[in-house]
Regions:
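HotDog/MaoC-like acyl-thioester-processing domains
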Residues: 1-20, 24, 108-175
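Hot-dog-fold acyl-thioester-processing enzymes
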Residues: 2-108, 174-175
Length: 175
């Protein structure tokens, strides 16, 4: 029997959440390698004709292979909904931070790519909670800002991307 992906939020106190700050996650490796099919499906979806995504000869000479679009970064580590091993999938670290609040919204995102991600790479990510704000009152509701950093490496250990993200986890204000 399969184990469904659980995107259920972890609940706890602000103090519980602070215990996660600065503690790197265990490395999590993608279930599949970066592939031309996914690169081109993404590029087709956004109608991007960049030859780095479509022309194998151009991409090989320029990048060492078809290059992954930056917008696809988080998709490489999205867990498969089922694996034959029965290993349960792991949700992103921000969902595992124990806090009050039933809703979250992305507030900011910034990524840096020191090296290209190319067809055939197998990515691994280490996630870390950088900070959790004290409780804030906003027009959306009362909650906490959670800042995370994800460091992506390829099979040789080289860092290919770093992604900084800020989520607001909150209880919606009454209408």
């Amino acid at each position: 029997m399969s184990t469904p992906i659980s995107y259920q939020l972890a609940f706890g106190t602000y103090e519980d959440a602070l215990r996660m700050v600065g503690v790197p996650s265990e490395p999590r490796t993608a279930g599949t390698v970066v592939s031309a099919a996914r690169i081109q499906m993404f590029a087709a979806t956004v109608q991007d004709g960049n030859p780095s995504y479509w022309d194998p000869d151009f991409a090989l000479q320029t990048w060492g292979g078809l290059v992954a679009p930056p917008g696809l970064l988080m998709g490489w580590l999205t867990p498969l909904p089922w694996e034959p091993s029965g290993r349960p999938p792991v949700s992103a670290i921000a969902i595992r931070v124990p806090l009050p609040g039933t809703t979250f919204i992305n507030a900011a995102n910034e990524a840096e790519f020191p090296l290209p991600i190319v067809e055939g790479d197998r990515l691994t990510v280490v996630e870390e909670v950088v900070s959790v704000s004290p409780e804030k009152q906003t027009k959306l509701g009362v909650g906490h800002f959670i800042e995370t950093v994800d460091t992506f490496t390829r099979q040789d250990g080289a860092v290919v991307a770093t992604n900084w993200n800020t989520l607001f986890r909150f209880t919606p204000a009454a209408s």
